[in-house]
């Protein structure tokens, strides 16, 4: 009975015993030391009830919540891998609550400036995070200065005051304005007009650099040339070179920016001009040399203009080519030299001379002609070519070459009759250029040797070929000259 009462007391007093402990601020050891001591008693066997388990879980949760509580003033913990990934891919991001951004502050935004009318598009605005480097941005020149080339990104000393005070100056209508504070989400929708001159009636920039104005304005100026040490001795080089041969008062790059050029290679011939470093459509101006006494940019020999940006080194220019005479290759008669006269030209020359009508002549039917004595024509052709062995068989084979070329044709059904295919005007203009007739040779240039001639000695031994000595021949008689 006593054990049953004791067991009943434990069943009823366990929740109250645990509830008398601190509700979560105590340690786990103090919360469990009481029931553990009673459960270890050999005389007490408490029944397992689900309420005890729920009480243990509730104390575990209260302990965890108490340890996990962090004051609101402390910063939250960010794992290391998160910061490492952001360091390589994006700017460092703090999870700590930031103060109110100055971009949303109406006192620091562009809303304090009065709205200006822009007829050519939106303003050229950038984020306020880039305000410190804005001092080196390319600004438009002073109202009284001349048009300056974009090749000079850094201004001179007299324009620096204007750059510092340009943040508070009001721009002229119709041109862009670089705002000091602007929204980071507002993107420029039009071309930044701050590179153009602010005066509406002043002349624009030089034409070869107009293509730079069609690009959007970057947040930082593009420095394409190496900046050298500024020497005050060359301060006058930035003045307009009007008295030194300047064109229309355009200003060439000042002494603040020095374009480095390669040294002249004296191994090449000075007559052949190499690739010019500047493609100018007018006369060129090169930089001053250290040994020159004159200040500024000196005028040198005019550069050769090249229309494209391709480096072309021609072998010779038009002015360097020597003009040869028209008759350089025609000092004498045009066909005097060996090999210069062609066969069809030789035939036209024979037909054009009336004294040759006994061995070659026109037939009167268009451009047809007949070789009355073909062997004589072949002999004369052999004299022109210095070939004594020339005959009509060789001449006729040469004429077949002109059949394929469309110059001559053989008249069918007639012997030694040919015709020219082309018109007479074209024929004589091609055969006699500049109306010069060929000078035909009447004899060979050198003595004829026996090797160049056909041997005819065997014909002298036969009496049949000498009718004046052998009398009338009887070819079919028994004593005739022909024996078979």
From Swiss-Prot:
DNA bind region: 341-421
Effect of residue 102 to A: Loss of sumoylation at K-96
Entry's Gene Ontology BP terms: cell differentiation; positive regulation of keratinocyte differentiation; positive regulation of transcription by RNA polymerase II; regulation of transcription by RNA polymerase II
Alphabetic keyword roster: Activator, DNA-binding, Isopeptide bond, Nucleus, Phosphoprotein, Transcription, Transcription regulation, Ubl conjugation
Crosslink site: Glycyl lysine isopeptide (Lys-Gly) (interchain with G-Cter in SUMO2): 6, 139, 322
One GO cellular component term noted in the UniProt record for this chain: nucleolus
InterPro entries named among the record's database cross-references: Ets_dom, ETS_fam, ETS_PEA3_N, WH-like_DNA-bd_sf, WH_DNA-bd_sf
Single GO molecular function: DNA-binding transcription factor activity, RNA polymerase II-specific
Covalent cross-link (Glycyl lysine isopeptide (Lys-Gly) (interchain with G-Cter in SUMO)), residues: 96, 226, 260
Location relative to the cell: Nucleus
Pfam families hit by this protein: Ets (PF00178), ETS_PEA3_N (PF04621)
Keyword Lipid biosynthesis in annotation: no
Modified residues (Phosphoserine): 101, 140, 149, 214
Function, as annotated: Transcriptional activator. May play a role in keratinocyte differentiation. (Microbial infection) Binds to the enhancer of the adenovirus E1A gene and acts as a transcriptional activator; the core-binding sequence is 5'-[AC]GGA[AT]GT-3'.
Protein name: ETS translocation variant 4
Source organism of the structure: Homo sapiens (Human)
Lineage per the UniProt record: Eukaryota, Metazoa, Chordata, Craniata, Vertebrata
């Amino acid at each position: 009975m006593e054990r049953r009462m004791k067991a009943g007391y434990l069943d009823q007093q366990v929740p109250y015993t645990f509830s008398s402990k601190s509700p979560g601020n105590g340690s786990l050891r103090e919360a469990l030391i009481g029931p553990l001591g009673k459960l270890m008693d050999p005389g007490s066997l408490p029944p397992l009830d689900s309420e005890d388990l729920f009480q243990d879980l509730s104390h575990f949760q209260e302990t965890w919540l108490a340890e996990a509580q962090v004051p609101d003033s402390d910063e939250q913990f960010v794992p290391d891998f998160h910061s490492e990934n952001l360091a390589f891919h994006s700017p460092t991001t703090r999870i700590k609550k930031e103060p109110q951004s100055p971009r949303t502050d109406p006192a620091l935004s562009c809303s304090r400036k009065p709205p200006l009318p822009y007829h050519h598009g939106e303003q050229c605005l950038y984020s306020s995070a880039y305000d410190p480097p804005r001092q080196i941005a390319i600004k438009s020149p002073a109202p009284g200065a001349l048009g300056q080339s974009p090749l000079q990104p850094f201004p001179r000393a007299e324009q620096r005051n204007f750059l510092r005070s340009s943040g508070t100056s009001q721009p002229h209508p119709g041109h862009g304005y670089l705002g000091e504070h602007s929204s980071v989400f507002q993107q420029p929708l039009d071309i930044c007009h701050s590179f153009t001159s602010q005066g509406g009636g002043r002349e624009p920039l030089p034409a070869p650099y107009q293509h730079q104005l069609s690009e959007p304005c970057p947040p930082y100026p593009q420095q394409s040339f190496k900046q050298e040490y500024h020497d005050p001795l060359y301060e006058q080089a930035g003045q307009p070179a009007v008295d030194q041969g300047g064109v229309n008062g355009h200003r060439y790059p000042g002494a603040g920016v020095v374009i480095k050029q390669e040294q002249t290679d004296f191994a090449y011939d000075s007559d052949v001009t190499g690739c010019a470093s500047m493609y100018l459509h007018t006369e060129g101006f090169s930089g001053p040399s250290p040994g020159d006494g004159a200040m500024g940019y000196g005028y040198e020999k005019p550069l050769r203009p090249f229309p494209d940006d391709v480096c072309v080194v021609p072998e010779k220019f038009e002015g360097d080519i020597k003009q040869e005479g028209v008759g350089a290759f025609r000092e004498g008669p045009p066909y005097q030299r060996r090999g210069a006269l062609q066969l069809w030209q030789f035939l036209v020359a024979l037909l054009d001379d009336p004294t040759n009508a006994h061995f070659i002549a026109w037939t009167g039917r268009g451009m047809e002609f007949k070789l009355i004595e073909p062997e004589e024509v072949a002999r004369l052709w052999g004299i022109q070519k210095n070939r004594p062995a020339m005959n009509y068989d060789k001449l006729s084979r040469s004429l077949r070459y002109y059949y394929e070329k469309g110059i001559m044709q053989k008249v069918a059904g007639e012997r030694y009759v040919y015709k020219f295919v082309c018109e007479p005007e074209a024929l004589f203009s091609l055969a006699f250029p500049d109306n010069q007739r060929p000078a035909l040779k009447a004899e060979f240039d050198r003595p004829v040797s026996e090797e160049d001639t056909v041997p005819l000695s065997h014909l002298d031994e036969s009496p049949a070929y000498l009718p004046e000595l052998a009398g009338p021949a009887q070819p079919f008689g028994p004593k005739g000259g022909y024996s078979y």
